[in-house]
Structures are given as C-alpha cells and as structure tokens.
C-alpha cells in the first residue's frame, strides 16, 4: 500500500474519532487539504467556524491571509503545501485547545507526518509550536529560526489570525516578519 493510500485510510479513521469532548460539538473533522506529495507541511492550531462548516483547514479569513503570505514568496498553498492542524475538531468559541484535546489529536498529526515525509514543517502560532515541539516560549521569541526535529526543518511563524489583528507591513511588525520567515522557507524549499 502506498503512503498516499495509507494517508487516505488514516483520514477516514480520523473522521470517525471520538477520543475527546470536541467530537460532541464539531460539525466536521477537519483533517487536511493540499498536495500529499508536497515537501512543505503547514500545521496550525485548530479549525475555526468556516473550517468546521467546510471540513477543510484554513478556508476562512486566516486561510486567505495564509494563502496570500505563501503566494507572496511564490509558494503555492495547494500544490507546494499540505495543510493541517494540531487538533482536527473546532474548539467551542474558537478557544485554544486544551492539553487533553491536544494529547488526543497529536497521534493523528504524527501519523500524517510519517506518511507525508515532509522536508519542511511550518508551525503557525504558539499552540502549534508548544504542541509539536514541546517548547513554551512566546512565538515572538522563537519565530523565524530553523529548528530540527527528526531530520525535518521546522520554521515557527506567527499564526495568520494574529496577522489579521496586526495588519501593518512596516519593517519589524508581525506581517513583515512573517514575510521574512516565509522567504527563508522558500529559500530552503528551492534548495531541494
């Protein structure tokens, strides 16, 4: 069985998940979107309202911001990336996922990574960084620096929803810094 077939089976299993209380309030399990053969994996925090409705990650305002940021450095969000979240179900009122919810969901992400075998992982926001890297530092301190995990290059960036709240493109501001971070991702991506 190919990795792609294994990934499809994993996603079918994931859509049936009832391992935490988020299963009681979700509309859809939001597994992933994008190219399963991509070398870039983008991991966010969790689905929002629009994602819960559609069943796909990053389709709301934050998703449009992410697409725009990626396109600005000539990374195609659907062809060059595979996009998922730490938790696959929407936390009520878009709250931060609890530790229990993260612990229930992280095995799904680990299996996705096994099947995808990405060369680069972009972690969008502090929840993704804390959950995946087990690092508790402000995203403002850790973003923009490459971290190695299991021979994969990992780049923490600000979450796109944070950029919506901080829209200035002035040098040194979050949106400008994210653009710099994604240029680093593009440079490494182009080297493969």
Each language-model region and where it sits:
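A polyanion-binding, active-site-adjacent surface
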Residues: 1-192
């Amino acid at each position: 069985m190919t990795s792609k077939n294994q990934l499809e089976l994993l996603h079918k299993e994931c859509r049936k998940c009832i391992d935490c209380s988020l299963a009681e309030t979700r509309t859809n399990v939001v597994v992933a979107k994008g190219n399963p053969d991509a070398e870039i994996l983008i991991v966010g925090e969790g689905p929002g309202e629009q994602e819960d409705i559609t069943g796909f990650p990053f389709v709301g305002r934050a998703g449009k911001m992410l697409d725009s940021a990626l396109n600005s450095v000539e990374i195609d969000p659907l062809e060059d990336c595979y996009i998922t979240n730490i938790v696959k179900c929407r936390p009520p009122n878009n709250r931060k996922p609890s530790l229990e919810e993260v612990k229930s969901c992280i095995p799904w992400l680990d299996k996705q990574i096994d099947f995808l075998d990405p060369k680069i992982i972009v972690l969008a926001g502090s929840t993704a960084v804390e959950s995946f890297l087990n690092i508790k530092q402000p995203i403002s301190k850790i973003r923009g620096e490459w971290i190695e995990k299991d021979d994969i290059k990992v780049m923490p960036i600000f979450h796109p929803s944070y950029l919506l709240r901080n829209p200035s493109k002035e040098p040194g501001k979050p949106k400008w810094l994210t653009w710099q971070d994604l240029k680093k991702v593009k440079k490494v991506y182009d080297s493969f």
